Structures are given as C-alpha cells and as structure tokens.
Amino acid sequence: MSIEVHAVSKSYGIQSALNEISFSAKKGEIIGFLGPNGAGKSTMMKILTGFILPSKGTVFVSGINVLKNPIEAKTHIGYLPEQNPLYEDMYVKEYLQFQASIFKVSKEVTTTVIKTVGLMPEVHKKIGQLSKGYQQRVGIAAAIIHNPDVLVLDEPTTGLDPNQIQEIRTLIKELGKEKTILFSTHIMQEVEAVCDRVIIMKKGELLIDKPINELKKSNEQIIEVTFDYKIEEQFIQRLPNMITFKNNFDNTWYITFDSTED
C-alpha cells in the first residue's frame, strides 16, 4: 500500500481534531477527502505529510514510518497545502529549479514537469503575475518535482473560476494514473468528477470510506442524532432498518440506516 493510516487521533488540549482514523490507499488511486470546514481533513493531511505529529496512531507512506523516519518519508510525498506557499517575486522557472535543487533533481526534469502541468506559456513570468489557476499549477509542479509516490492536495481548486477548476481536475486525473493522490474538498460533485474513492469526515470522525460507484448505488443514509439524555446501545440496535451506529461523544450518535424503505 502507498498509504497506511492506523488509528490516528489528534487532540489540542480537551479538543479532539481526529478520533481513531484508519484507512489505506494503493498506487493509482485518487481518493477524495470530503467534509465540511472543521472536519479534520487538513489535520489528517498535515499528519500524513509529517508536518505535525498525531497524539496517537501510526502512518506509513511507501512502507516508511512517517513518525520515525519523517525526512525519508517526505522524499516519497508531494504536498500542496491549502495556503499555497509561493515566492511571488521569483520567476516560475527559477522557483521550480530552486525546488528541484532541494531534492537534487536535474534541470531537465524541471523542464519536463513544467510541460506536464501546462506552464510553458507562463514560464518566464513572475509567480505574482500569474492567475490563481496558474499559481496552483506552480504549486502542483513543486509538489511533483521529485517524482513522489504519493501526492497530497489540500483543496487545490478553492478560489478558482469554472474553467480553471476543470483544468486542475483534468491535471489531477492525469497525475493519478501513476501516483496515489489524496485530494480534499467540501464539494461532492468534485469528488465524483475526479476520484475513484471517497472518505467522508465530520468533526474528526471517519463516517464513510467507499468507492464512488458503490456510494452512488448505496441506499444507506447517515444521520447525526443528539439525545437529551444518555442512551444505551440496546436502544439504538432496536431501531428499524439500522445498519451501523457509532457513539461520537456524550449523547451524540452517528446512525446508518437502509433507506430502501421509507
């Protein structure tokens, strides 16, 4: 597996950002990380890429323990954070050659990557002169400059116009033919357009992990219920058409029902 996440939790004091998250991904999969703001998507991505540590759990990328060998693991990871960290006063080619030098990549590879992401027409411009869509392409180019096995993209289409969104989606699908891609968004239509599989999160919990085609066929419905008082599991188990349930915290439950019958 390219990505293996085992029982990862992250807390900030008494606030839980992630609760026992586990999933895996194989080469060539594009996985959509779907959820509202505050679901824990960015936190999980920062842990996966070695930028923050989990409170507990383990993470492996290309068989390397990210927590024990973060520097080695990062050579296998390309990461585009939500806030694209670009040097706007640098020229496109200059910036990407600088990124390549960090990984000791040749100038020839830099040119190939520039062509791959469609930056040739803009290569002699300063990054600050580019549109948001082309700036995202620069960020993606920097993320793949060292030919990583895993590409982590945190909301890469946010703030783009419809044409730019379509262009970035097409680029991601092309890159996904050879790499494992984890792609976060809060728009379901985007997941359907780009991804093979979806992981749905809410309030630090993993609610669904399914292939897109299975999710479309599914008659399951998940609801979040907060009771006024403590409820025993036996009560939940007796609910009609109940498939699964999970106690999130206190008196709040996530309950999955078969919605074939009203």
Residue ranges of model-derived segments:
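Short, charged/polar, Gly/Pro-enriched secondary-structure boundary elements
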Residues: T260-D262
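ABC transporter nucleotide-binding domain
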Residues: E167-D258
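ABC transporter nucleotide-binding domains
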Residues: S2-I3, K10-K202, L206-I208
